[in-house]
Structures are given as C-alpha cells and as structure tokens.
From Swiss-Prot:
Source organism per UniProt: Homo sapiens
Primary gene name: ELMOD3
Listed name of the protein: ELMO domain-containing protein 3
Function: Acts as a GTPase-activating protein (GAP) for ARL2 with low specific activity.
Record bears the keyword Cytoplasm: yes
Coiled-coil annotated spans: none
C-alpha cells in the first residue's frame, strides 16, 4: 500500500487518535405526527430551539413490536430481485455473483502485509507525561506493555492513522460486509450513497466520519459483525439505534467507541490485560465490544436519547479506562448467556431453568454514576 491508499489527516484533525471526533450536521429533526427522529442536518446544539427535547420527555418509553406488513415484504422481495451494482465500475453485474464477504483476519492481514511506514512514523504510542503526572503514573499507574507486544500495539495505532480508500478493493469489501451483515442484504451496494445514513453514518460517504479513529473504526465494526459470538449483540445494538425515540447514529457511535479504545491503549489502560493474554489486537477488539455493550445497556435501561450522547460518552470513557477488566468480564458473561438464549439487550428475558440468572444480575461498571442528564456539548459534533 502506498501513501495514497491510506489518507492521513492533518495534525489538527487527527493527532494520534485524539483529533476532532466527528463532523457537524448529523442531528435529528422531529416528525410530530409519527414521533420519529430523523438525522437530517440540524445541529445538535440547535435541538433545544426546535422543541424536540421537550417532546421526547413526554413520549412513553415503550418497546412496541413492529408488525411487518405485506407491502414491506413485497418491496423487500422486489428489491432483492434487482441486479447488484459493482462499486468499482458502477455497471450492473449478475445478482448471482455478489461480492465476497471479508473476515476480520483477512482484512487485518492486508494491513500486516502492505507498507505502512509513512503512517507509522506519525504515531505516538503512549501519552507523554511530565512533572507530577509522570511521577504519579510511575508509582501508581498500570504496568508497561511488554516489549514483544509493542509492535502489535503500534500496528493498531498505525491502522488508526489510515483513512478509507474507496479505490482499494479490500477497503470496499470491508464496507460491503458491514452493510450486508447489519441489514441482511445479499447484494452489493454503492460505496457512496444515502443508504449509508441508514447505518448511522453522517452522510453519503463513510470516509468523512472516520476522523479520530481512521480505518480502525471500520475494522472494529467488521470484527463485531463477523464474529459469530458478537454478531447477535451487534444486531441488537443496531436495532436499539433505530428505536423511534431512543435512536442514535449507530456507526458514528461506534467510531466514538473506537476512539475511546485508542486512547485507552495509548494511556496504557489495557497494558495489564494485554500482558496477561500476551496479545494486543484481540484485547483491543474485546475492549471495544465491551464498551459498546455497556453504552447500549445504559442507553436502553436509562432511556437515553441523542441529547444525552455527549454526557454518556464522556462518562463512558472515564469508566472504560478505569475498569477495563470489569467491562471485559461483563462482556464474557453476557456473550455466554446470549449463546444459551438467556440474555438479551432488547427482548424479554429467556431463562431455561433455575440455573439461568437474569441479565439484570450482570454487573455493569459504574452504572449508578450515569444518571439521566442532558448535555449540550455532545461528541457527535
């Protein structure tokens, strides 16, 4: 891969994963008749002027099962009968030959084999501390990452410097796979278009939403949807993101969580766990998934809306960095129960016998600290 394959943002936009998180212009507007939030260009800071937040507080927070009408089923069948369009050429191709899904390991191998040296030079693997902060970190901070794991850590941070290149076939397959696994579509879609807004990107081009996390944000989404253990969780969080009152931009929220993972890695919050497992990438992936699970749980149970997003994300970052091991343990327990049909973020509890503990018994780190609160300074800007 040459430098054109990975677009590197300026220091102001992306300084070792600390840059401006997301662009403005992805905010909800309100349909009074249907009580639906649609993200169509109203700045979040302006929501209070449109009566949206007041209206949200008056709605009943009930989960209503949606009945799929025959018209919807027919439309879906007609859509699936349409020939797919290849993103590289824009020409029609046989619907019997859709693009092949790509696994996380295959996508990772792509970055392990191409030349990323121009981007690796620009990373700052750890936070630089001086004075009392350095002394305090030395005496009371987490352990240093083992020397043999630092190359793997640097690869993670280097991928976070790379942007999305729509001309790179691997990049395109990653996007296609994420879209298909979340929507259930069997066919390819254009790499630019309004359909990406349905997944929670800001606009028609997903590349514009990766600042602060780079291509690592897409690799994390790929991991979430291609791992058979985390796919049900990803689908549940995606459904939560489309709730008629509590909806939020799924992919933008995921980018923010990847940014938290980058910061936790650079601040050595994950070093102890990486040293214990003798690997970095799986730990970072699990930390990302565990943090996303915690956010979804708080969002669902505390009835958060988009106006709470800034506060929730700031508190989430503090909690995730403080107690990564507890988050990872919660994820492990949750996935084990989901595999047995005993836990669900959205649906009713399923217990098959007295030995099956309810999902509410899982300990979510710092849950009591996240009280209902609205914040004007949101991260989705």
């Amino acid at each position: 891969m040459n430098e054109k394959s990975c677009s590197f943002h300026s220091k102001e936009e992306l300084r070792d994963g600390q840059g401006e998180r997301l662009s403005a212009g992805y905010s909800p507007s309100y349909d009074k008749d249907k009580s639906v939030l649609a993200f169509r260009g109203i700045p979040i800071s302006e929501l209070k002027n449109h009566g949206i937040l007041q209206a949200l507080t008056t709605e009943a927070y009930e989960w209503e099962p949606r009945v799929v009408s025959t018209e919807v089923v027919r439309a879906q069948e007609e859509w699936e009968a349409v020939d797919t369009i290849q993103p590289e050429t824009g020409s029609q191709a046989s619907s019997e030959q859709p693009g092949q899904l790509i696994s996380f390991s295959e996508a990772l191998q792509h970055f392990q084999t191409v030349d990323l040296s121009p981007f690796k030079k620009r990373i700052q693997p750890t936070i630089r501390r001086t004075g009392l902060a350095a002394l305090r970190h030395y005496l009371f901070g987490p352990p240093k990452l083992h020397q043999r794991l630092r190359e793997e850590r640097d690869l993670v941070l280097t991928i976070a410097q790379c942007g999305l290149d729509s001309q790179d076939p691997v990049h395109g397959r990653v996007l296609q796979t994420i879209y298909k696994k979340l929507t259930g579509s069997k066919f390819d879609c254009a790499l630019h278009g309004n359909h990406w807004e349905d997944l929670g990107f800001q606009g028609a081009n997903p590349a514009t939403d990766l600042r602060g996390a780079g291509f690592l944000a897409l690799l994390h989404l790929l991991y979430l949807v291609m791992d058979s253990k985390t796919l049900p969780m990803a689908q549940e969080i995606f459904r939560l993101s489309r709730h008629h009152i509590q909806q939020f931009p799924f992919c933008l929220m995921s980018v923010n969580i990847t940014h938290i993972a980058i910061q936790a890695l650079r601040e050595e919050c994950l070093s102890r766990e990486c040293n214990r497992q003798q690997k970095v990438i799986p730990v970072v992936n699990s930390f990302y998934a565990a943090t996303f699970l915690h956010l979804a749980h708080v969002w669902r149970t505390q009835r958060k809306t988009i106006s709470d997003s800034g506060f929730v994300l700031k508190e989430l970052e503090v909690l995730a960095k403080k107690s990564p091991r507890r988050l990872l343990k919660t994820l492990e327990l949750y996935l084990a129960r989901v595999s047995k049909g005993q836990a669900s973020l959205l649906g009713a509890q399923k217990c098959y016998g007295p030995e099956a503990p309810p999902f509410k018994d899982l300990t979510f780190t710092g849950e009591s600290d996240l009280q209902s609160h609205s914040s004007e300074g949101v991260w989705l800007i």
